[in-house]
Each structure stands twice: as C-alpha cells, then as structure tokens.
Amino acid sequence: MSDAVDIQREWSELAQEVRKHRELYYNGEPSIPDADFDELFQRLLALEAEHPELQTPDSPTQQVGAAPEGAVDIEHLERLYSLDNVFSAEELQDWLDRTPAEAYLTELKIDGLSIDLVYRDGKLVTAATRGDGRVGEDITANARVIPDIPHELTGTDEYPVPSLVEVRGEVYMRPDEFEEINAARREDGKPTFANPRNAAAGGLRMKDPEDVKKRRLHMVCHGIGARERFQPTSQHDAYKALEAWGFPVSPYTQRVTTAKEVQERVTYWEEHRHDAYFEMDGLVIKVDDLASQRALGATSRAPRWAIAYKYPPEEVTTKLLNIEVGVGRTGRVTPFAIMEPVFVSGSTVSMATLHNQFEVKNKNVLIGDTIIIRKAGEIIPEVLGPVLDKRDGSETEWVFPENCPACGTKLAPQKEGDQDWRCPNTRSCPAQLAARLEYLASRKALDIGELGEKAAADLISSGVLEDEADLFDLDEQALLKSSVYTTQKGALNASGKKLLENLKTARQAEFWRVLVALSIRHVGPIAARALATRFGSMEVLRAASVEELADTDGVGTIIAESFKQWFEVDWHDNIVQKWTAAGVTMEEESSDKPAQTLEGITVVVTGTLENFTRDSAKEAIITRGGKASSSVSKKTNYVVVGENAGSKEQKARDLGLTILDEEGFTRLLETGEA
C-alpha cells in the first residue's frame, strides 16, 4: 500500500473520530475527556499542515461544531465562531507575535455551553445553542427561566437600548450547586452528572422549562454579534454596555497592554483556577479594538483576533483505600479505586477508574498507596500512578476476583487475548440487568424518567423483573412488591403511578429508540436511526443479511455482525416478542419516512450550502435511502457543490461525474432525478 493511501486513511480515521466526539460534545454527551479530544484535534491539524492537500472545506478543522440533533433550528444573525487553542507559553507567544495590538482583553474560558440571544427593541425574541456556528437549537423557552438572562433590557444615557443586538454568552452551573444537585440525584437513585458542563447542557435541552429551573443555571456574557444603533469601539466598551443593559459579565476580565502581562495572567489563573465561581479550563485572549478585529478577520472556524490558552487537566494526590470492581450492562468487569475524598476540577471525588486488571498491574498501584489522579471531564477520574517515595511497606497487592461480585459466575475474557474480563451470565446477572434497565430508560433510548439506578436495582432484587422482557407488562399489582414504588403502608406511590404512565408513553417511542433500548452492542442512536430509516421495521431488519445491514450508511460490518449475533440468542428474541405483544413500536411511522427517492444512489456533498448544514444534508440523503459518502470515487452518482468546494469538485470533474448545485440537490431529494 502506498504512503499516500496510508496518509489518506490516517486522515479519514482522525477526521471521523473528531466529528463523532465533537457531535457528542455539543449534544451534551461527551465520551472522552476534553484533553483527549484536544489531542485528536491537534493531530489532525498537524497532519493537514504537513499535507495541505488533505484540508478541504468539509474537514473538521474548517468547521465550528456540530448541528444539534432532533430540534427546531434557528439561524444565527452572525456566525458564532469557535476558538483556536494553544497549550504552551511558546505557542501563545507565537500568536501574540503574529497578532500585535495596543491592548488585549483577557477573560476566563468558562467550561459551559454557548448561547446566542437576540433582542429586538430591547426584548428577548430568540435563544439558541451554538450548534454548528451557523444554525443552533431553539432553546428560547428554556432561556427565559434562567434568572441571569433578562427578558427586557434597561438602558442608560451612555448606553441606550439598541434596536437590535445579538448577545453571546456561556450557560454554566456553579460547582457548589452542582454538588448539591448530584447529591440529591444520588439520594433519588438517579444517575449523577459527569460535570457541571454536562448538567448545564442537558438542562438547556429539557422539554419542560419548569424542569430547567431546577437545574439552577447561570449565564455570563462574552461577546456580541449583529447589532443596530450600537457601535462600540472596543471589546471592553461592549462589555460595559452589556452590563448597563442588565447582563452579567465576568468580573475576572482584565485589559492589558503588553504580551508580558498576557503571559502573567495565564500563569496567575492556572494557579488560581478554583478562585472563580464557575468552572474554567483556560484563558481567552482577545484583541480589544473592534476595528482591528474586523481587519484581522477569521478562518472558516475561528477568529484570528482571539485565542484560547487551554490548561492541562488538574492532577492531585490522595490515599488509595481499596480497589473494588463494578459490572456493566455488557458484563464488562471494571476495577475502580476507593479513595480518601479529594477536590479536583470543580468537584469532590472518592472513586477513580482503573479500567482493567492489567492496567492495575501496569500502573503498579497498591492498596494503601498515595496515588496521583486527574479528572478531565469524566465523572470518575483516572488514576495515573503511585507516589513511590510515599510508600512505607504497609501497602498490599490487589487480586482480581475469579467470580462475578454480583452473581458469583466465573469471570473470563470474551475471546482469547482480551484485556477486559466479563461475567458471562448476561441474562440473569443482577448488575448487568440493572444497568440495561437504566440504559433503556435513558434519554438516548426510551426516556423513562421514573426508572433510575436505584429503582432498576429494586425491581430486580424484589423479584418484580427477571429480565427486561417483562418491563412493559408491569402493572400496579406487580409494583406493590417493590419498595421504591410503594408507600410505607404498602400502596402504590406517586413514582409508581408515574412509571406506569412513562411505560405507556414509551410504547409509542420512535422505532430507532427501541433499537437503542435493546442494548445491542455498538448500536447507538446514530446507527439505530440509519437502520430504522432504511429497513423500516423489525421484521425486515431481522431478515436482512450482514452485507445488507453493513451497506447502510453509518453502520458498517462490525455493527452489522453484532446486530445479527444479538438475535441468535433465544432470550433476546423473547424480549422482542414480548415487547411486540405489549404494543411497543416495531416499525417506522410511514408518515415520518420520506419517499425513498435515493435508493441505491451515492451522493457526496462538498462546500457550504445555503439551506443545509453538513449534517442536515447527510441526513436528507440517508433518510431517502441514499448513501452519503465523504469521498469522491467512480462509484459516486452525484456530487453536490456549494461555496468553497475545494478538491472534491475537481476530482468529480476529472472522473466525469454529475455535478449539482443546491437547487439540483433539492430536486434530486424530491424526485431522485437531477
């Protein structure tokens, strides 16, 4: 295989990873620490710098974020850019040398969720998330219940209310309030939030504004977009105006005039990161003069007049008291550290992941060690290793258990060479079943609010459920055996009544959500949507071959094989049969499914379209039965070309492929013909 092919493959894999994790991040469900994402993104940037031909307009390095899923969209009046990052004093100095200015504004980089607010004649008319920078999710109703967001602006003689202003800010949760909310959720048996940012992101997307109030969200402004009858000359002048109109602005913002002062502010806040009343993960440096900002302009994803200095994940030491193991919904047995409570990255923690038994050995940690941990976005921090010179000889080696702590079954790797060991008692292991129940009740699946961690465990231990097959057969009589859903006098309580209502609603959930709820390995929301859209029903899906499943855009061989293998297990089949008999949705609503105009057709979209984001164009193709490809080849049927299309357009012309503009793309979607 040639070097060029290897490099192209490396770029494709990196780009796909960045897109996936960016989408999860902007939808409030990050699966890796921020530091790991930054490392992926920097690797992609470096690869494109070394091989400029790889950088195309649809590369993740040229885009701001991810369009939100499943929500009403609002187009921002002015584009909401992301920020480029630096990670060292040397990189920051390089930026300062390239971007000289009379003054800079330094402000803390709040670890929250960006929000875009539009006011006309002083009144709030819309609120949206960042989305992909051009289009965001409509969260107006939820924004109105955040106390820091004014419904109507107040003016002063110096700063009268403008006829139009677009305000940018960050929604966040205070660390102390985050701890209180997590404590209450633990008490109720509900899953705790990973960090304040996840809690804030989830809160902004809640269906009921009354529930949003309970999240105790805050907002602080960090910029302006479109405006009429308001022309500030500097960033700090704009902040004074925002404050005069009734907006909260950060008290930690400081105007400096030299590069040395900028570096001093970076050092100061790295040492005092917990002094702020919100979570922060860096310092943002902006050219203060707005005319200079306009002259410097922006790349396709970030302004040239601003940079974010990202601090490394915080590391602290604590005492390792014990090592225990947990069993997940797939049977994976994971050791975790029990530690003396320690404050790190905005919250107090007493547990940390150790991944698997081999990781414990490789990290050379002993029970009783003083250990180094870091927390970079996940709910359970990571153990980095021991402080060897703190050992006094009293430490003891940990031994991995031979049997499952939940059911006693002998543990084993799923296949030879696996580092992860599993409990093979998939159906009856109470830990696995409880985790599956909690997962199917999550927002990404059937959204059953009254079925949390504590309730799931109680349904199993009380004998109400043997497995998830009987979930939709639950009635009042069955729930009376449960302590979670009954009063002290033995009657059904409010949670029990609400659970039965939740189950009625869940029976009508969209088909793709049912597929997610089955806990088929590797089948998450994206693959489930693609399978549901293409095949339409459980009956057709089960009859499809591995090749047919794998050919579905967004699926592939690994997911296809996992899907087929799941149905080879008898009790899995029983779940589907019982859910079907209980009236659970097992096919797509015909009214929801567009005409399959693109069946068998491969389409590549490149460049910027006026009425489609990258993700919405891809979704439009997939939901009509087509394949949305990211690369041009002889197998491509159509190439849709927008502004700044780049090398893909030229390759399409070289191959003699049919090229469409946006109007032709719309016609193709409607009719299947160009």
UniProtKB/Swiss-Prot annotation:
<comment type="similarity">
    <text>Belongs to the NAD-dependent DNA ligase family. LigA subfamily.</text>
</comment>
<feature type="binding site">
    <location>
        <position position="130"/>
    </location>
    <ligand>
        <name>NAD(+)</name>
    </ligand>
</feature>
<dbReference type="InterPro" id="IPR013840">
    <property type="entry name" value="DNAligase_N"/>
</dbReference>
<keyword id="KW-0235">DNA replication</keyword>
<feature type="binding site">
    <location>
        <begin position="34"/>
        <end position="38"/>
    </location>
    <ligand>
        <name>NAD(+)</name>
    </ligand>
</feature>
<comment type="function">
    <text>DNA ligase that catalyzes the formation of phosphodiester linkages between 5'-phosphoryl and 3'-hydroxyl groups in double-stranded DNA using NAD as a coenzyme and as the energy source for the reaction. It is essential for DNA replication and repair of damaged DNA.</text>
</comment>
<dbReference type="GO" id="GO:0006260">
    <property type="term" value="P:DNA replication"/>
</dbReference>
<dbReference type="Pfam" id="PF03119">
    <property type="entry name" value="DNA_ligase_ZBD"/>
</dbReference>
<keyword id="KW-0862">Zinc</keyword>
<feature type="binding site">
    <location>
        <position position="407"/>
    </location>
    <ligand>
        <name>Zn(2+)</name>
    </ligand>
</feature>
<feature type="active site" description="N6-AMP-lysine intermediate">
    <location>
        <position position="109"/>
    </location>
</feature>
<feature type="binding site">
    <location>
        <position position="286"/>
    </location>
    <ligand>
        <name>NAD(+)</name>
    </ligand>
</feature>
<dbReference type="InterPro" id="IPR001679">
    <property type="entry name" value="DNA_ligase"/>
</dbReference>
<dbReference type="InterPro" id="IPR036420">
    <property type="entry name" value="BRCT_dom_sf"/>
</dbReference>
<keyword id="KW-0234">DNA repair</keyword>
<feature type="binding site">
    <location>
        <position position="107"/>
    </location>
    <ligand>
        <name>NAD(+)</name>
    </ligand>
</feature>
<protein>
    <recommendedName>
        <fullName>DNA ligase</fullName>
        <ecNumber>6.5.1.2</ecNumber>
    </recommendedName>
</protein>
<feature type="binding site">
    <location>
        <position position="429"/>
    </location>
    <ligand>
        <name>Zn(2+)</name>
    </ligand>
</feature>
<dbReference type="InterPro" id="IPR041663">
    <property type="entry name" value="DisA/LigA_HHH"/>
</dbReference>
<keyword id="KW-0460">Magnesium</keyword>
<feature type="domain" description="BRCT">
    <location>
        <begin position="593"/>
        <end position="674"/>
    </location>
</feature>
<keyword id="KW-0227">DNA damage</keyword>
<dbReference type="InterPro" id="IPR004150">
    <property type="entry name" value="NAD_DNA_ligase_OB"/>
</dbReference>
<keyword id="KW-0520">NAD</keyword>
<dbReference type="GO" id="GO:0003911">
    <property type="term" value="F:DNA ligase (NAD+) activity"/>
</dbReference>
<dbReference type="InterPro" id="IPR004149">
    <property type="entry name" value="Znf_DNAligase_C4"/>
</dbReference>
<dbReference type="Pfam" id="PF01653">
    <property type="entry name" value="DNA_ligase_aden"/>
</dbReference>
<dbReference type="GO" id="GO:0005829">
    <property type="term" value="C:cytosol"/>
</dbReference>
<dbReference type="Pfam" id="PF00533">
    <property type="entry name" value="BRCT"/>
</dbReference>
<dbReference type="InterPro" id="IPR018239">
    <property type="entry name" value="DNA_ligase_AS"/>
</dbReference>
<dbReference type="Pfam" id="PF03120">
    <property type="entry name" value="DNA_ligase_OB"/>
</dbReference>
<dbReference type="InterPro" id="IPR033136">
    <property type="entry name" value="DNA_ligase_CS"/>
</dbReference>
<dbReference type="GO" id="GO:0006281">
    <property type="term" value="P:DNA repair"/>
</dbReference>
<dbReference type="InterPro" id="IPR012340">
    <property type="entry name" value="NA-bd_OB-fold"/>
</dbReference>
<feature type="binding site">
    <location>
        <position position="310"/>
    </location>
    <ligand>
        <name>NAD(+)</name>
    </ligand>
</feature>
<keyword id="KW-0464">Manganese</keyword>
<feature type="binding site">
    <location>
        <position position="170"/>
    </location>
    <ligand>
        <name>NAD(+)</name>
    </ligand>
</feature>
<dbReference type="InterPro" id="IPR010994">
    <property type="entry name" value="RuvA_2-like"/>
</dbReference>
<keyword id="KW-0479">Metal-binding</keyword>
<feature type="binding site">
    <location>
        <position position="423"/>
    </location>
    <ligand>
        <name>Zn(2+)</name>
    </ligand>
</feature>
<feature type="binding site">
    <location>
        <begin position="82"/>
        <end position="83"/>
    </location>
    <ligand>
        <name>NAD(+)</name>
    </ligand>
</feature>
<dbReference type="InterPro" id="IPR001357">
    <property type="entry name" value="BRCT_dom"/>
</dbReference>
